[in-house]
Every structure is written in C-alpha cells, then in structure tokens.
A protein has these predicted regions:
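Cytosolic juxtamembrane N-terminal segments of multi-pass membrane proteins
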Residues: 1-10, 127, 146, 153
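Residue-level signature of catalytic and energy-coupling elements of molecular machines
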Residues: 68, 92, 129, 148, ...
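Active-site-proximal gating segments in proteases and membrane effectors
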Residues: 98-124, 184-189, 203-258
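Short pre-active-site segment immediately N-terminal to the catalytic Zn-binding motif
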Residues: 130-144, 193
C-alpha cells in the first residue's frame, strides 16, 4: 500500500501540447492558406503564419490561467456561507493546518448526492462539496471526505486534475468530441492511476479514523451519478460511468482492512 502514496501525477506538458496542437494547427493551416491564396510578399506571408502561432500560444496560456474559474463555472457552485457551513469551514481549517497547506475556499453545489472535489490552478485552492454532503454526513464522515480533498491538494493531484480536465474539456464534449478518445487518454496519462487509493490512505493518515471516510464513501455510493462526463475525474467518488481504475467496493474493502 505504500507504493500508492509514493507515485504522483505525471507531467502536464503533454496536456499543453495537445491543447496547443488542437487549437493551433487549424489556425496555422488557415494562415498558410491565406498566404498562398492572397498574393503577398513572402515576409508578410511568414508574419501571418507567425501571428497564428502567437495567437495559439496566447489562447493556450489564457485557458491555463483560467482553468479553475472555468471548472467552477461548469460545476455551477456558490460560495458556502461561513455561518451555515461553519462545521465544514472548521474541519477544513484543522485538516489544512495538519497537512501543511493553506485552507482552500469552500464552495457548494446544489446536488443532493454525497461527494466533494478539489480545484487548484497553481496557488489558492478550492474545496467543493455537494449539498448532500453538507446535510447528510455527520462530523466524522464529513471530516473523512474533506480530508481526501485536502490530501489531493497536498499531494498535487488537485492541480494535475484541474489543469488536465480544464484544458482538455472542450475536446471531451460538444462539437470537438471527435477528439474525446485522445483527450481522455491524455488525461489518464497525467493522473496517477492509483489516485483513489492513495487519496483514501492519505486522508486516513490525516484523520486517524478510517470509519469516517469509509462511511462517507458508502453514502456517496448510494447517491452515485453526480456530475457531467467532463468533470467526472475531479470527484472523490467519480460517477460509475467514468474511467476510474478502482471500483468503490475495492476502496471500501481496503479501508475496512486499514
């Protein structure tokens, strides 16, 4: 089990290359076509092509700088009131202090299932919990679920998942979904294949109380089905249709043995 905690997410460079290629190749080809069809000096034609390449670099950087905002908008979250959700805020503060990371902002979705996720672009992070998690879980269960969120932030998984999913989301659904198989493979390449197990074990190391997370995951399983295809990998308990390597029953069995 120790090995699941040692391996982290892979390099994000292929994600940026994929996005730049998917956006830039059509732009560069269009620029070349314009340079060929419209009579112009060679230098001007080269400038058109260089301009297309520069636009590609700008669009790639702009997308990266806003991936956290893009995903929070996609999830349709609202700020969690610090009075109504004082318990969650207090738990996040304590768990963050224990793990050595800055406490994330807390957001809420109106979904009545039990689930949570972490969003992080580079610095500040965000924790998102469902209304179901806020209302259905007792303190120990919520602590276990939030501990997994903090563990993903501390271990780098939150940033890797945020950037990979946020950058490649345009190619997993909608008019560009013909690129979905390649985009999905790229996301899976970046994310640690043991991420669910390593997250569970890191969360338990934070709380020192495996039943809390176990019971939260059991309730999440009963409420499974949250989220869209594009955000499935972000959740602590991914929808059953996602490409999660480990079935939830395996995760629960390991927690029962812990």
């Amino acid at each position: 089990m120790d090995s699941t905690q040692e391996s982290g997410p892979g390099s994000l460079t292929p994600v940026f290359v994929f996005y730049a290629a998917a956006v830039g190749i059509p732009l560069v080809l269009l620029a070349v076509l314009i340079a060929v069809v419209i009579p112009m000096p060679l230098v001007l034609g080269l400038l058109v092509v260089v301009g297309a390449a520069a636009l590609t670099a700008y669009l790639t950087h702009r997308r990266y700088s806003k991936v956290d905002e893009i995903l929070l908008d996609e999830l349709d979250v609202v700020d969690a009131d610090d009075h109504d959700h004082a318990r969650a805020y207090n738990l996040l503060e304590a768990l963050s202090l224990r793990s050595g990371v800055e406490a994330p902002e807390l957001f809420l979705t109106d979904d009545e299932s039990v689930n949570a996720l972490a969003i992080q672009q580079s610095g500040d992070a965000a924790a998102v919990i469902t209304a179901g998690a806020a209302h259905k879980l007792d303190r120990l269960q919520l602590e276990g679920l939030l501990a997994e969120v903090i563990a993903r932030i501390a271990g780098g998984d939150a940033r890797a998942a945020t950037v990979a999913v946020g950058m490649l989301m345009p190619f997993t659904e909608g008019p560009l979904s013909f690129l979905a198989p390649a985009a999905d493979a790229m996301i899976d390449r970046v994310l640690n294949p043991e991420r669910e197990l390593s997250g569970d074990l890191a969360a338990v190391n934070l709380t020192r109380y495996p039943p809390g997370l176990r019971d939260a995951l059991e309730l999440a399983d009963a409420d499974s089905g949250i989220g869209t295809r594009s955000t499935a990998r972000l959740w602590v308990v991914p929808p059953s249709s996602s490409s999660s390597r480990y079935d939830l029953t395996v995760r629960l069995a390991i927690l029962n043995e812990y």
